Design a protein with these regions (language model features):
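Short, low-complexity disordered leader/linker segments with a strong preference
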Residues: 36-81, 406-409
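Extracytoplasmic ligand-binding site segments that recognize negatively charged/polar headgroups
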Residues: 127, 132-277
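Interhelical loop and adjacent transmembrane-helix boundary motif
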Residues: 1-28, 32
Length: 409
């Protein structure tokens, strides 16, 4: 259960001052005023009026203390602001309002479209308290000393909530800098009325070269994901730095775009596959889960040659203005209620083990939808590793693939 850490707040001093002041007033009323009344109205001095007045004062004291303590204790960050930089449409509908109500802080959330866009903005000095980059970008930012370590309390509390498969991934082996926000895999979304499981088992990633599906496939406009697919189809590591292996993957993709007439898309694949506009496509597991929930004829397959196990995680940049509140936010997001809101609304897999089991289990929102629960512990699945030289090579080769695709029409 998430409980906001208790910290000394300046308003405690105000409470102490109020206690002293009101007790002094009460004693004055009870002890001084009767002497005045004795001089002016001796016949009434034995009436219990002074206890009534004292009672009113005491009630007022208790009410004042309760109200002030409630405000100070339950909203220790009142008046503060948290700046978050996250992907678009990646937050549950009650996440922000829930955290603001709990802490009294105001949350300002900006959105980015790519890890590279986020990196450039932060590298240029824009200050955020919480970022939600992908695994390989977190590794890069750690290498460049752009992040600060999490509080020990945050690390301990959050790790206790996480699915084992998402703990200690290679980019941050001890989770000293990051706590997962969502996770998943990359796979093939397919129309079960057009594509058989036998085809998928036989071809794996090479199904994107099967002439039976020419003109009926989507590729995803991402050099990392497209080269991952090609490298895995060829039996290579997706983290290879071999120029020969990268060239082989390039030729595989060239063959695909020149012979298969694919449509290269981004998020359009979600609605298009939900409407069964093509037979199959390269997709993130969370998007596939949505497609399958919208269309019962859709399936999701992860080839046996392996795929990418990815994670987007929360980190705190070195130049964060409110790291204490940032740690509070990270603990909040990992808690059951917030994680449930996030995952049930967005559709991506929660790192919170209880939420994942509930949503993906019997009677859950994603019961029977295998895309919601990523394959874990498979030795041929990999997490992306950051290598600047390889990144530049792949970016250049992917640009050539897209030119070839345009010329093929």
């Amino acid at each position: 259960v998430y409980t906001m850490s208790k910290r000394i707040n300046p308003s405690v001093n105000a409470i102490s001052t109020l206690v002293v002041l009101l007790i002094t007033i009460t004693l004055t009323i009870v002890n001084v005023l009767p002497m005045i009344r004795k001089k002016t109205s001796p016949s009434k001095q034995n009436k219990p009026w002074k206890w009534a007045v004292a009672g009113v004062v005491v009630v007022g004291l208790v009410a004042s203390l309760f109200g002030l303590n409630k405000s100070a204790g339950s909203q220790p960050y009142a008046g503060q602001t948290l700046h978050v930089y996250n992907w678009g449409e990646y937050t549950g509908e009650n996440i922000i309002s829930g955290f603001e109500e709990l802490t009294g802080a105001k949350v300002i959330m900006d959105n980015f479209d790519s890890n590279e866009q986020m990196y450039i903005k932060v590298a240029n000095g824009d200050a955020y308290d919480v970022l939600v980059p992908s695994d390989y970008m977190i590794q890069r930012m750690m290498q460049e000393k752009m992040l600060q370590k999490l509080e020990p309390e945050t690390r301990k509390e959050c790790l206790g909530e996480l699915v084992d498969a998402i703990k200690g991934l290679p980019y941050d082996p001890k989770n000293e800098y990051s706590i997962p926000y969502f996770w998943g895999t990359v796979g093939i979304v397919y129309d079960k009325t057009k594509v058989s499981e036998e085809d998928l088992e036989k071809d794996g990633w090479d199904i994107f070269l099967d002439q039976k599906f020419k003109g009926d496939i989507y590729l995803y406009d991402s050099e990392r994901d497209s080269f991952m697919m090609a490298l895995k189809a060829l039996g290579y590591s997706m983290n290879t730095t071999s120029q020969d292996e990268l060239n082989d993957a390039y030729n595989w993709l060239i063959q695909c775009v020149q012979t298969m007439d694919p449509e290269i898309v981004t998020d359009e694949i979600i609605d298009n596959m939900a409407q069964a506009r093509k037979a199959l496509g390269l997709i993130y597991s969370g998007d596939a889960a949505y497609v399958m929930s919208e269309n019962e004829n859709m399936g999701f397959y992860m080839p046996k040659s392996g795929t990418n196990l990815w994670s987007d995680a929360m980190v705190i940049p070195k130049n964060a203005k409110n790291p204490k509140l940032a740690n509070e936010f990270i603990r909040y997001i990992t808690s059951y209620d917030a994680a449930m809101d996030n995952s049930s609304y967005v559709g991506y897999t929660s790192p919170n083990k209880e939420v994942t089991e509930e949503l993906g289990g019997k009677g859950g929102d994603y019961d029977g939808i295998n895309a919601y629960t990523p394959r874990a512990g498979y030795d041929k699945d990999e997490v992306f590793q950051y290598d600047e030289t390889t990144r530049k090579i792949i970016a250049d080769l992917w640009s050539r693939v897209k030119v070839a695709a345009s010329n093929a029409h």
